[in-house]
Regions:
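C-terminal motif of bacterial Sec signal peptides marking the signal peptidase cleavage site
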Residues: 16-18
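Metalloprotease/metallohydrolase-associated module, dominated by Zn2+-dependent proteases
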Residues: 142-169, 185-228
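Positively charged n-region of N-terminal signal peptides that target proteins for export
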Residues: 1-4
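Metzincin-family zinc-dependent endopeptidase catalytic domain
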Residues: 55, 59, 63-173, 185
Length: 228
């Protein structure tokens, strides 16, 4: 896999309107934070429970991600996808990330922590999972509440359940941010049913079920380029 840039070229964000701004891994028993010697996809996806996000919840998300990524990455053997997603050890969000006036955690600070945890290893994409409210500053608004944030391209994402209306939306937001980390931008067609549509300050994930044809083609080109 072609090495990812050490300097992050962009950050992708999901917004929501109405804001100022013990156990073992399923399929990877005892893996913890260790990595497969030769990741079949060229990288692995680590789901990192943060704070009160439980290991069990992360395992449930993992099962859904394996299923959905198997559809999105349909050219890859299912066993490759199964072997490439694991639940890592729980971490606490650093107190330095807390913005006390709104009781929100700066998403950028969480990304920095996740990026540094593996020393910038571009063979692992770490997705932090939290129930806490997260935020960033964008469009002239300071500390704007968001659902997710990722480096694009990069090795870290963070997703929050705080603004999600349905449990089923979690895998959708997670895949949205993960695909940003692979370099996929927002849907250029602005297709309401596409997982990569910009949220436009609204939570419309209940309407989304997959990628539009344009985003599928863009992802194929990105993956082909990274595999050279």
């Amino acid at each position: 896999m072609k090495k990812l840039l050490l300097f992050i070229t962009g950050i992708s964000i999901l917004f929501l309107a109405g804001c100022s701004n013990g156990n073992q891994s399923h399929g990877n028993e005892g893996m913890g934070d260790s990595l497969p010697a030769d990741p079949p996809l060229g990288y692995v996806i680590e789901l990192k429970p943060l704070g009160k996000f439980s290991h069990q919840e992360a395992e449930q998300l993992r099962e859904e991600l394996v299923k959905q990524l198997g559809i999105i990455l349909y050219t890859k053997p299912k066993a490759w996808v199964e072997a490439s997603v694991f639940v890592g050890d729980k971490r606490e969000i650093p107190a330095s990330c807390l913005y006390k006036p709104r009781n929100r955690y700066w998403a950028g600070g969480i990304l920095k922590m996740l990026h540094e945890e593996h020393g910038g290893n571009d063979e692992i994409v770490t997705i932090g999972l939290t129930h806490r409210d997260i935020s960033t500053s964008i469009h002239g608004q300071y500390n704007y509440g968001i659902m997710g944030l990722s480096f694009r391209p990069g090795d870290a994402c963070v997703v929050s359940t705080f603004r999600l209306k349905r449990k089923d939306d979690l895998w959708k937001v997670t895949i949205h941010e993960f695909l940003h980390s692979r370099g996929l931008p927002h849907c250029k067609k602005d297709d309401l049913k596409c997982l990569m549509q910009d949220a436009h300050s609204k939570n419309t994930f209940y309407m989304k079920h997959g990628l539009c044809e344009d985003c599928k083609n863009s992802l194929r080109m990105i993956m082909a380029h990274q595999e050279r």
